[in-house]
From Swiss-Prot:
It comes from Chlorobium limicola (strain DSM 245 / NBRC 103803 / 6330). Presumably involved in the processing and regular turnover of intracellular proteins. Catalyzes the removal of unsubstituted N-terminal amino acids from various peptides. One of its GO terms (biological process) is proteolysis. It catalyses: Release of an N-terminal amino acid, Xaa-|-Yaa-, in which Xaa is preferably Leu, but may be other amino acids including Pro although not Arg or Lys, and Yaa may be Pro. Amino acid amides and methyl esters are also readily hydrolyzed, but rates on arylamides are exceedingly low; Release of an N-terminal amino acid, preferentially leucine, but not glutamic or aspartic acids. Coiled coil: none annotated. Its main location: cytoplasm. This is Probable cytosol aminopeptidase. Binds 2 manganese ions per subunit. Its EC number is 3.4.11.1, 3.4.11.10. The gene is pepA.
Length: 503
């Protein structure tokens, strides 16, 4: 998608689809005059409410309207940045369905939009572009069309090849800044989605590492990949235990972005990289198991976030740590009741092999603290079904030992639309993960599953005072039936916004 900004008057822009955005307030004030000036009948406004993401397509009379087609795009009240992202996603989705390749958006009123949302012009534009990337995303690389008896070009969805934002001359610079940031964040989020959408037979631990290496080459940050022998030498018993049933070796990948000049903060991001989770010996039910290819969503989002930070040039050192393996049953697989020794030296009784994510995260969290001692440690993981029971599929669970850190993450979630809700992390829950034969069990008693998993993880941060765990099991993947099913890339925007705040 070629995205550009222009100050050319709207009436002189040549495009297949002219988009006129309206907030609910603007709709009431001057919508009739705007539409009539552009050559369209204002009668359509009777049914248009300007709700965020609402679209009405107009067809102009030949020689009267400035474009053959126009779209009224609702921005809601315009008081939330997320409304602009939502509207853009709806626009992109509609344009692709209509096979429109050229779109122009009249952003002449962007300064007013920013004022209403108590934000900046750049932030509004960035959110809008992110929404365009979200709505235009398709994962169809594995489709061959071989079974179609007749290939009909009209059936093929066309991508938007050109998107133009029209702005007033005084706002051009800010719009361009927002556009550039939105392209980076949006493309990095879609990169993460591509990784998650790959099936388990096409994405193993080594492929995740290769994706990280390629990202580092593109964006100039260091990537170090530890193979199985090195993982064994480190004594990462959690990662090795999960990998025991697999025919494919594990990897532990470290991405290290070091900005030039003064570093404002050093942040470690840990992403769970289970490429396919069968549950191991504690085998999952077959229904929905195919979606367990998404159990490496945390890893994908960490790669996307590190790349985005590098491309944005933020003055934050960001270290991404990704323990990766699949979790499979076999004659050599770890069994319920086994006791393992983690990288930290803490012993764990494996009460359930389907509670594998916390085992590989345990090693990575300890490694982050011991090797880098960063200012902040944040891990992202599709960790528990219990978090879905508590919060559903649109909100992630947030657990943290630091109130200020939790507040910052919550605020970033509100801005980006990747919302989190803080959950308890009290020591009373430790009783539920006690073991009679080891230091701790990876399986809690019935109830509070997302909380006991978080209490388990906290034992492996080696006393670090600023740590947060984000359970993205719910919002990381959309089941079939959604407007765009599959991976969402949840966490990329959230982390980037958080790191911008700390810059």
């Amino acid at each position: 998608m070629n995205i550009s900004v222009t100050a050319t008057p709207v009436k002189k822009i040549k495009t297949e689809l002219l988009v006129v955005p309206f907030t609910t307030g603007a709709l009431k004030k001057n919508a009739d005059g705007i539409l009539q000036d552009l050559g369209y009948d204002a009668v359509v406004l009777r049914d248009f409410k300007a709700d965020a993401g609402e679209l009405v397509i107009l067809y102009g009379a030949a020689g009267k309207a400035i474009a053959a087609r126009a779209a009224l795009l609702g921005m809601g009240e315009g008081k939330k940045v997320t409304d602009f992202r939502k509207a853009a996603a709806a626009l992109a989705l509609k344009a692709m369905d209509m096979k429109i390749e050229s779109v122009a958006v009249d952003f002449s009123g962007v300064k007013g939009f920013a004022s209403s949302a108590k934000s900046s012009v750049a932030s509004i534009c960035s959110a809008f572009i992110e929404g365009c990337y979200t709505g235009s995303y398709r994962f169809d690389r594995l489709k061959s069309d071989k079974l179609k008896k007749k290939k009909d070009e009209s059936d093929k969805t066309k991508e938007i090849s050109e998107l133009v934002l029209r702005a007033e001359p005084a706002q051009l610079s800010a719009v361009e800044d927002g556009l550039a940031a939105g392209i980076i964040t949006g493309s990095c989020q879609n990169m993460a989605r591509d990784l998650v959408n790959l099936p388990g037979n096409l994405l193993q631990a080594e492929d995740i590492s290769a994706a990280a290496v390629e990202s580092g080459k593109r964006c100039g940050f260091e990537v170090n990949v530890f193979g199985k022998e090195e993982i064994e030498a480190l004594g990462m018993g959690g990662l090795l235990a999960v990998n025991r049933g697999s025919q494919h070796p594990p990897t532990f990948t470290v991405l290290d972005y070091k900005p030039e000049g003064k570093v404002a903060k050093t942040v470690a991001l840990v992403g769970k990289g289970v490429t396919f989770d069968s549950g191991g010996i504690s085998l999952k039910p077959s229904e929905g198991m195919g979606e367990m290819k998404s159990d490496m969503s945390g890893a994908a989002s960490v790669i996307g976030a590190v790349e985005a930070v590098a491309r944005l040039g933020l003055p934050i050192r960001v270290i991404g740590l990704i323990p990766a393996t699949d979790n499979m049953p076999s004659g050599s697989a770890t069994k319920p009741g086994d006791v393992i020794t983690t990288y930290s030296g803490i012993t764990v009784e494996v009460g359930n092999t389907d509670a594998e994510g916390r085992l590989i995260l345990a090693d990575a969290l300890t490694y982050a603290k011991k090797q880098y001692n960063p200012d902040v440690i944040i891990d992202l993981a599709t960790l528990t079904g219990a978090c879905i029971v508590a919060l559903g599929y649109t909100v992630a669970g947030l657990f943290s030992n630091d109130d200020r850190l939790a507040d910052d993450i919550f605020e970033a979630g509100q801005i980006t639309g990747e919302k989190v809700w803080r959950m308890p992390l009290w020591e009373e829950y430790d009783e539920m993960i006690k073991s009679d034969v080891a230091d701790v069990s990876n399986l809690g008693a019935r109830g509070a599953g997302s909380v006991t998993a978080s209490r388990f993880l906290e034992k492996f941060i080696d006393g670090h005072k600023k740590w947060a765990h984000i359970d993205i099991a719910g919002p990381s993947f959309s089941a079939k039936g959604a407007k765009v099913s599959g991976a969402t890339g949840f966490g990329v925007r959230l982390l980037v916004e958080l790191l911008k705040k700390w810059s």
